[in-house]
Amino acid sequence: MSQPIYKRILLKLSGEALQGEDGLGIDPAILDRMAVEIKELVEMGVEVGVVLGGGNLFRGAKLAKAGMNRVVGDHMGMLATVMNGLAMRDSLFRADVNAKLMSAFQLNGICDTYNWSEAIKMLREKRVVIFSAGTGNPFFTTDSTACLRGIEIEADVVLKATKVDGVYDCDPAKNPDAKLYKNLAYAEVIDKELQVMDLSAFTLARDHGMPIRVFNMGKPGALRQVVTGTEEGTTIC
């Protein structure tokens, strides 16, 4: 088996990646497949942190446009990430993976409150740590959470799992001739206005020299290929 090129990673999974063909909720089969792929990394000795989005359950920004207070909507979105985190933790447990769910705010009896030193300790013990509830503050996306937690836990890379094979020069769903980039510099992404993640999250990663790899989690084995150095997806650094 190929050896991993990363010791510690932060895996960002969108909420949409968890939903099935009906476009709603959580597809247990997808969740279980992701748990098995994460287990492969743990068995290779990789330390894994996970951030989940909540868009499969709730999108606060859309309701904000309809008149809901943005702060209230974002709080609801944070709770959606906790629900996804609970589902992921359960799938990991069933795959015999030791996992800990942490929330950015207190949810006594449901999960632990985020604590940096405790998270580091658990990662060193090869436990998967799931970071939920975003940053705990409104107006910040889960991409920002992924970059923030990745920097805090001193991850080697932020792996952004998407439904496409990496970063393209235009939308591949609309243009079959879209060009896939293999490597990009931070400045290129900004200059070309490429859609990798929101600007706040991206500049946070850039300012702290945190590499980002964008890949298609829908491809079986893609996560392992990324971690073992196979030319999969797009690398930004």
Swiss-Prot record:
Keyword tags: Allosteric enzyme, ATP-binding, Cytoplasm, Kinase, Nucleotide-binding, Pyrimidine biosynthesis, Transferase
Binding, UMP: 54, 74, 135-142
Region (Involved in allosteric activation by GTP): 20-25
EC number(s) reported in the record: 2.7.4.22
Subcellular location: Cytoplasm
GO BP term, example: UDP biosynthetic process
InterPro entries linked to this entry: AceGlu_kinase-like_sf, Asp/Glu/Uridylate_kinase, Uridylate_kinase, Uridylate_kinase_bac
Residues that hold ATP according to the record: 12-15, 55, 59, 162, 168, 171
Listed pathway(s): Pyrimidine metabolism; CTP biosynthesis via de novo pathway; UDP from UMP (UMPK route): step 1/1
Domain of life: Bacteria
GO CC field: cytosol
Main localization, broad class: cytoplasm
Entries under Gene3D superfamilies matching the protein: Acetylglutamate kinase-like
Annotated Pfam families: AA_kinase
Ways its activity is controlled: Allosterically activated by GTP. Inhibited by UTP.
Reaction catalyzed: UMP + ATP = UDP + ADP
Molecular function (Gene Ontology), one example: ATP binding
Function per UniProt: Catalyzes the reversible phosphorylation of UMP to UDP.
HAMAP family: PyrH_B (MF_01220_B)
UniProt record similarity statement: Belongs to the UMP kinase family.
Record NCBIfam families: pyrH_bact
PANTHER family recorded: URIDYLATE KINASE (PTHR42833), URIDYLATE KINASE PUMPKIN, CHLOROPLASTIC (PTHR42833:SF4)
Oligomer and partners: Homohexamer.
Name this protein carries in UniProt: Uridylate kinase
Species in which this protein is naturally found: Haemophilus influenzae (strain PittEE)
Gene, per the UniProt record: pyrH
